[in-house]
Amino acid sequence: MSETKHTLHTPGWVSDFQKFIMRGNVLDLAVGVVIGAAFSAIVGSAVKDILTPFIGLITGGVDFSNLFITLKGPVKDTLAEAQKAGAVTVNIGVFLNAVIQFLIIAFFIFWLTRILSKLSRKQEAAPAAPPAPTKEEVLLTEIRDLLAQKNS
């Protein structure tokens, strides 16, 4: 039974951790989380700054960010004022913005995975060109052809 000896400077867990981190799926996951966080900020801004005003325009000027119900406390015109006054509120507009953000992210991810899936299927479907024959194969083919000519 062989034993792996580790020096004082490189304990066994360091190499195990390196193997774990260098696995492809761990790196892919880390990249996905970072890109997802950045994309979430972009989508959040798109919903808040671009889509919500249009939806508010269509619905007669309703500002979703200030759509709330006061359960307890002073009734105020805006959510910020109500929260500052200590009112207990149900923030319907904030929830609607989160739902819209989720739907946009889900829609984008759906199309992204669909496109990537089609691209990977096309790459798999394209047959690889056969490798060029080696020198030995060319020589053997020539010998075979010469023997076939000699025997005919």
Swiss-Prot record:
<keyword id="KW-0812">Transmembrane</keyword>
<feature type="transmembrane region" description="Helical">
    <location>
        <begin position="26"/>
        <end position="46"/>
    </location>
</feature>
<keyword id="KW-0406">Ion transport</keyword>
<keyword id="KW-0472">Membrane</keyword>
<feature type="transmembrane region" description="Helical">
    <location>
        <begin position="92"/>
        <end position="112"/>
    </location>
</feature>
<keyword id="KW-1133">Transmembrane helix</keyword>
<keyword id="KW-0407">Ion channel</keyword>
<keyword id="KW-0813">Transport</keyword>
<dbReference type="Pfam" id="PF01741">
    <property type="entry name" value="MscL"/>
</dbReference>
<dbReference type="InterPro" id="IPR019823">
    <property type="entry name" value="Mechanosensitive_channel_CS"/>
</dbReference>
<dbReference type="GO" id="GO:0005886">
    <property type="term" value="C:plasma membrane"/>
</dbReference>
<comment type="function">
    <text>Channel that opens in response to stretch forces in the membrane lipid bilayer. May participate in the regulation of osmotic pressure changes within the cell.</text>
</comment>
<comment type="similarity">
    <text>Belongs to the MscL family.</text>
</comment>
<dbReference type="InterPro" id="IPR037673">
    <property type="entry name" value="MSC/AndL"/>
</dbReference>
<protein>
    <recommendedName>
        <fullName>Large-conductance mechanosensitive channel</fullName>
    </recommendedName>
</protein>
<keyword id="KW-1003">Cell membrane</keyword>
<dbReference type="GO" id="GO:0008381">
    <property type="term" value="F:mechanosensitive monoatomic ion channel activity"/>
</dbReference>
<dbReference type="InterPro" id="IPR001185">
    <property type="entry name" value="MS_channel"/>
</dbReference>
<dbReference type="InterPro" id="IPR036019">
    <property type="entry name" value="MscL_channel"/>
</dbReference>
<comment type="subunit">
    <text>Homopentamer.</text>
</comment>
<keyword id="KW-0997">Cell inner membrane</keyword>
<feature type="transmembrane region" description="Helical">
    <location>
        <begin position="50"/>
        <end position="70"/>
    </location>
</feature>
